Amino acid sequence: MSAPRLLISIIIMVSASSSSCMGGKQMTQNYSTIFAEGNISQPVLMDINAVLCCPPIALRNLIIITWEIILRGQPSCTKAYKKETNETKETNCTVERITWVSRPDQNSDLQIRPVDTTHDGYYRGIVVTPDGNFHRGYHLQVLVTPEVNLFQSRNITAVCKAVTGKPAAQISWIPEGSILATKQEYWGNGTVTVKSTCPWEGHKSTVTCHVSHLTGNKSLSVKLNSGLRTSGSPALSLLIILYVKLSLFVVILVTTGFVFFQRINHVRKVL
C-alpha cells in the first residue's frame, strides 16, 4: 500500500472510530478517539469531534493532571486539575471548543468539539503520580478537503481549481498537457487555493483534471469547445458598443444633413 493511501486509511479510521481510550474509558461514536504513547503526529479531518487521551493511569493514583496546548498564533494554554483540592485551573485558554470530556476527576481526557483550522498545534497531557510523571503528546494537523472546480476559459484553455484545501492539493492533467501556470493563494486560516491553467490543441475533445489530497483524490472532466471565445475585459466590450453607436449616429447625421441641403438647393432653384 502506498504512503498516501495508508495515510488516508488512517484518517478514515480516526474519523470513524468508536474505540475506547487506553485505560478502559469508552468513547461515544460521535468522537474520533486518538491514542498513542509518547509523541505522535496525528492528521484529523475538520468538523469531526476529537478526543485526546491522557496516559492510562488509574485516577486513584494521580496527584495533578495538566494539559499543555500550543496553538498557531496563540499564547500557550494550560488546563490543570489538582485531585487533593478537587480544583481546576485554566491559563491563557482563549480558543473555544477545547474542554475536558467530563469532570476531570472522572475522565482526564481532552475533547475538541468540533475540530477546525484554529486547533492546529501541539497538545500534551501530563499526569503526576507518586510513581513519577507520565505524558502523551499530539502534533495535531487539521485537514480540510478542497472544493474542486473545472471549466473552460478563453480559446481552448482548461482551468482547474482546488479551493481552500489544507494542506495544498496537487493538480495533474489527463492526458498530460503543457501547463501554462499553477498558482497558489494562501488564506489566513491556513488553507490554500491551487489554480492550474492548461491550454490544449484543437484535436483534444475531453480533458480530465486530477486533484490529489491527503483527504482523498478527485477527478473531473470537461468537453472542450473550440468555438468558445470570451472578450478580454468588460471595458473592451463597452468600447465596442460605444464605437457602433457613434458610427450609427454619424451615418444618421450625414444622411439628415444631405437631405437638408438637397431641399435648400431645390428651394433656391424654384425661386
UniProtKB/Swiss-Prot annotation:
Q: Which InterPro entries match?
A: CD200R, CD80_C2-set, Ig-like_dom, Ig-like_dom_sf, Ig-like_fold
Gene Ontology cellular component annotations, sorted alphabetically = external side of plasma membrane
Extent of the signal sequence:
1-23
Instruction: State the name under which the record lists this protein.
Output: Cell surface glycoprotein CD200 receptor 2
Q: Does the keyword Amino-acid biosynthesis apply?
A: no
Q: List each copy of the Ig-like C2-type domain by range.
A: 133-221
Any idea which UniProt keywords this protein has?
Disulfide bond, Glycoprotein, Immunoglobulin domain, Membrane, Receptor, Signal, Transmembrane, Transmembrane helix
**Annotated S-S bridges:** C160-C209
UniProt topological domain (Extracellular) ranges: 24-239
Q: Show which residues sit on the Cytoplasmic side of the membrane.
A: 261-271
What's the domain of life for this entry?
A: Eukaryota
Give its localization: Membrane
Q: Which Pfam families does this UniProt record tie to the protein?
A: C2-set_2
Q: Which residues are glycosylated?
A: N30, N39, N86, N92, N189, N217
Every Ig-like V-type domain range: 46-132
Name the GO terms of the biological process aspect: regulation of neuroinflammatory response
Gene Ontology MF term list:
signaling receptor activity
Q: What does this protein do?
A: May be a receptor for the CD200/OX2 cell surface glycoprotein.
Task: Indicate the family of this protein.
Answer: Belongs to the CD200R family.
Location, primary (coarse class): membrane
**Annotated TM spans:** 240-260
Membrane topology is: Single-pass type I membrane protein
